[in-house]
Amino acid sequence: MRAAGRWHSAGRPIVYLAEHPASALLEVLVHLDIGDVSALPMAYQLLEVATAAKVVVLGLPANALNASWRDDLGATRAIGDAWLASTQSALLRVPSALVPNVANYLFNPLHADASRVSIKSVARYPFDNRLFKVVGGGGKAGR
């Protein structure tokens, strides 16, 4: 990812992963800036990632985030940038800003264990137009 994201500053190599296919879809949809369903790609790709048994996955401590963390990109970026710089783990479990009690994972492709994280499968999924009736109304995709 080249642009800044919720958990990192611009220019830092990082890969965002979702805990579940449904949350991955929500993460894609929330970032789309397309005014009409017909402008969407026919499908998105869902990648399943596998890790070797000894790859360390850190969890973000509960007290690391303040009550308004969803609106404080400076704070979440500082946390992610510090984790990337620390090289403590190849993966960091972080909360989803979209859905309570759901996690996302940050993957540091520059970590020494990065080669022990691999793509297990790739599947193409079509966008279901019913999603856009809910999101934007009348077949229009919205934010």
Where are these regions (language model features)?
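Active-site and NAD+-binding cores of ADP-ribose-processing enzymes
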Residues: 35-143
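Long, hydrophobic N-terminal alpha-helical segment
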Residues: 1-43
